[in-house]
């Protein structure tokens, strides 16, 4: 099985919160697709709570679109990582890391402005697979933590995993 790009970076050297360009590609029609690693937590040291990450999933995607989508950029998807240390964001376009960091910070402020569970979009049994598994309080704590720490930038060249460590 081929080694995925996300496993070619040294997770022990990742900073968080931080933005990283995980992958870029071009479609057959010539559109640029960029995948960003939005690392909320330091890998293997911190983790997002299940209810908090689920509530973020419902809120973050909409707020990021509000702050980042433009004539040149369109978010395709924002999905939580299985390891619960962040999200992957796929989009059409090539914003720089600082644009993404700014949108992320603005989105965290928007999350803090959500005052009650009833304001969480798609929070019902018809649109959510586990609609009872949410915590606005956890989402607020995560957002506050991101804003207090500030969003940095992780560069792939700084995180390249040594060949000797691959598959070890």
From Swiss-Prot:
Q: Name one GO molecular function term.
A: S-ribosylhomocysteine lyase activity
Q: What class of enzyme is it?
A: lyase
Keyword Lipid metabolism on this protein? no
Q: What is its EC number?
A: 4.4.1.21
Q: Which family does it belong to?
A: Belongs to the LuxS family.
Q: In UniProt terms, what function does this protein have?
A: Involved in the synthesis of autoinducer 2 (AI-2) which is secreted by bacteria and is used to communicate both the cell density and the metabolic potential of the environment. The regulation of gene expression in response to changes in cell density is called quorum sensing. Catalyzes the transformation of S-ribosylhomocysteine (RHC) to homocysteine (HC) and 4,5-dihydroxy-2,3-pentadione (DPD).
Q: Describe the subunit structure.
A: Homodimer.
From the Swiss-Prot or TrEMBL record, give the protein name. Answer: S-ribosylhomocysteine lyase
Source organism (scientific name)? Histophilus somni (strain 2336)
